[in-house]
Amino acid sequence: MKDLTDKQQAVLAFITTIIKERGFPPTIREIGDEFGITAKGAYDHLKAIEKKGYLKTAKNQSRAIELIRQSPMESIPVQATSIPVIGRVAAGLPIFADENIESYIPVPDEMAKGNVPMYALRVQGDSMIEVGIDSGDIAIIEKRDIARNGEIVVALIEDEATLKVYYKEQDQIRLEARNPKYKPIKTKKATVIGKLVGLYRIY
């Protein structure tokens, strides 16, 4: 792998920091805003860093940035906490009931917010691909029962958990996919059981 320029190191360090803080990468626009450059300039930096073997990008996805190698400025070991991977969420059972837990995975302590309960769900389907969430990813969830409009949440509808963008309307909840082939779900019976705070992906 080739050495990075100072600006490329700074861009890679910014991407690494954002992923550590919120679990998913910044958009090209966010990178441009951080460094005072155009989206085209940010894209050119990403492609140059990719050619040097530090990350991978995917076409037509604003957040599809996958780190392969850390920036030399970000080589400090990361402390981790184990959280449960929840299988099918059964109505009437606590989320952390033994019957629901498939396994445990480590997440960085920066993502684990003190004593706030956290869990993980395996993503199935392609309804959130436009925000870089793919089938097979493990969604890192902060357990909570309230949400703000525009947040990505886990909502329980009858006996099924779904990962969608939350909007509270006057007399119902609207849950939106981030894939145009899926229509919004409008319901009065959805229960919020968590908010997305990160993604765990195995390569």
From Swiss-Prot:
Residues 28-47 bind DNA. It catalyses: Hydrolysis of Ala-|-Gly bond in repressor LexA. The keyword Transcription applies. One of its GO terms (molecular function) is serine-type endopeptidase activity. Pfam families: LexA_DNA_bind, Peptidase_S24. InterPro entries: LexA, LexA-like, LexA/Signal_pep-like_sf, LexA_DNA-bd_dom, LexA_repressor, Peptidase_S24_LexA, Peptidase_S24_S26A/B/C, WH-like_DNA-bd_sf. Belongs to the peptidase S24 family. PANTHER family: LEXA REPRESSOR (PTHR33516), LEXA REPRESSOR-RELATED (PTHR33516:SF2). Homodimer. This is LexA repressor. It comes from Leptospira borgpetersenii serovar Hardjo-bovis (strain JB197). The lineage of its organism: Bacteria, Pseudomonadati, Spirochaetota, Spirochaetia, Leptospirales.
